[in-house]
A protein has these predicted regions:
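A bilobed periplasmic-binding-protein/Venus flytrap-type ligand-binding module shared by bacterial periplasmic
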Residues: 132-142, 245-259
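A conserved helix-loop-strand patch within extracytoplasmic ligand-binding domains
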Residues: 104-163, 271-275
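Extracytoplasmic "Venus flytrap"
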Residues: 28-46, 62-65, 169-172
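Beta->alpha turn/N-cap motifs
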Residues: 65-66, 76-89, 106-107, 167, ...
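Ligand-binding pocket segment of bilobal, Venus flytrap-like solute-binding proteins
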Residues: 158-237
């Protein structure tokens, strides 16, 4: 009886171990994203593409701002999310490196540093630059001859009526408004800014278009779709303040080893995404109010990535 019990226990223990290993093998890939329009779009692109290839996912899209999502990745609370090459300069502590001003060089540097330090893998980026920018209402820009941030600096110094809608992240991060103000020698007073909850440029652009609380300028991204339609003009950045922000999927090494097909699934998709394409897709969400998941699915089907 004792021998039987021991054997039974060994069989049971083996079964439990096998079940545990099986659960580990099939545990879903947890995909997060930031809360901005493009973050939601790209997060859903990743979810739908992996699901269509038979990889189970847990949708954590629209998780939070850059700090929240990055912290979740490093803590192992999510497995992957779409990030931007230019953010590597600030996440990895090498802001002065000129590599960040070039898409490929910035990508290779971020890929190397993040893997060495954190075992985070950067998959291939899109050929697009979603850099931070400042956009001004066209009527204001035309009336005051504003084409570049040098012109904005002159206008602000001359007490021109200027009020910027932006996210708290853009206002506070050293590579956001502080970088523009330092490079172009202007300083906005508190009453010249309107901080909007979240980080979505759809809200900041609309605030400028609708003159909300006197706003006539907005934090914007290089791949924002509705700028022209809503009558806003991006101010040129002749001093090249901003790094190149090319979107790329980031994934924990452990998760990629668990599902090595992820790289071959996502690489051709991200390579198909250029600036004009992202502008069009973002516009469907920001202007037409379409659901990011629907827009992502429509794009993937139109290119034959999913059925």
């Amino acid at each position: 009886m004792k021998q039987f019990s021991t054997r039974a226990l060994l069989v049971l223990a083996g079964s439990v171990l096998a079940l545990g290993l099986h659960a580990q093998q099939v545990s879903p890939i947890r995909i997060g994203s930031k809360i901005d329009t493009e973050g939601k779009l790209l997060g859903n692109v990743m979810v739908l593409a992996l699901e269509a290839s038979g990889i189970k996912t847990e949708n954590r899209v629209s998780l939070g701002n850059t700090k929240v999502v990055r912290t979740a990745l490093l803590a192992g609370e999510i497995d992957m999310y779409p990030e931007y090459t230019g953010n590597g300069a600030f996440m990895l502590g090498d802001e002065s490196n000129k590599a960040w001003k070039d898409l490929r060089s910035g990508y290779e540097l971020a890929k190397k540093m993040d893997f060495e330090r954190n075992k985070i893998v950067w998959l291939e980026p899109a050929n697009a630059n979603n850099t931070w920018a400042i956009a001004v209402r066209k009527d204001v820009a035309t009336a005051n001859k504003l084409r570049s941030l040098d012109d904005v600096s002159r206008y602000v110094a001359g007490n021109g009526a200027f009020k910027l809608a932006a996210s708290a992240e853009f206002m506070e991060r050293p590579d956001g408004l502080p970088a523009f103000q330092s490079a172009y020698s202007f300083k906005l007073r508190p009453e010249q800014t309107l901080v909007l909850a979240g980080g979505d440029t759809a809200a900041t652009i609309r605030a400028a278009a609708e003159k909300t609380s006197g706003v006539n300028a907005a934090m914007a991204y290089g791949t924002d779709g509705p700028l022209a339609a809503l009558g806003l003009l991006i101010m040129e950045d002749p001093r090249g303040v901003q790094p190149v922000y090319a979107p790329a999927p980031l994934i924990r090494e452990e998760a990629l080893k668990r599902q090595p097909k992820i790289a071959e699934i996502l690489t051709p998709i991200f390579k198909s995404l250029d600036g004009p394409t992202l502008q069009q897709l973002n516009a469907r969400i920001q202007l037409e109010g379409q659901d990011p998941k629907k827009v992502a699915g429509d794009y993937l089907r139109s290119k034959g990535f999913i059925k």
